[in-house]
Amino acid sequence: QVHRGPVQHACYPHRAEAIVDSGKFDWNAHADKFPGLTTPDESYHGVTYTERFGLEGAFITKATVQLMRDLGSIPSPNNCFLLNIGLETLPLRMKKHCENAQAVAEYLQGHEKIAWVQYAGLPGDKYHERAQKYLPNGTCGVVIFGVKGGRAAAEKFMAGLKLASIATHVADAKTCVLHPASSTHRQMTDEELAAAGVSPDLVRFSVGIEDAKDIIADLEQALANV
């Protein structure tokens, strides 16, 4: 998996005719929620908009019956102002996110207490060639990895971080960390976690735009106590 935003993804050279970005990530350096068009909407008896209304009608139907209902017909002036402010620095921030994430992935890959690292910017990653082709402006800012020792070790590592914030969202200007098995996926059994691809040792690390040396130093001191 690769978390990628509109800055990294070279859509048009690969025959994309139109690009729609939700603004969920990256735009203003903070996270928000934009429900998908291909997932069931429980507020309307589980309807999936793309299946019910087709590709041409899905977006406008969802925008009318759900988003306009919940959020109003247009963003508030203040939200538009904040998004515009964020867009002014979007290329600079995304470049830093990607550079820092690459440095973090390379550091973790060689650490004795890390079992595995998944980041498409690493030459050995199974998605590396695709990232090189489709993400010429940088891979992404999210690194996932496993801490040796399983769930207990992963939780202890996360609790020992001082710079990174424990948070469920990604693509924030600050570094955020999450242990899915004990948080977002805690309601699942071990069998369900395995089926979902969430191992007990998995840590999701959303790399911010702080100095890379500070981020790595935080990782180092937290891993030293595991």
For the regions a language model picked out, list residue spans one by one:
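Catalytic PLP-binding core of fold-type I/II PLP enzymes
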Residues: 1
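Active-site C-terminal subdomain of aminotransferase-like
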Residues: 5-142, 146-176
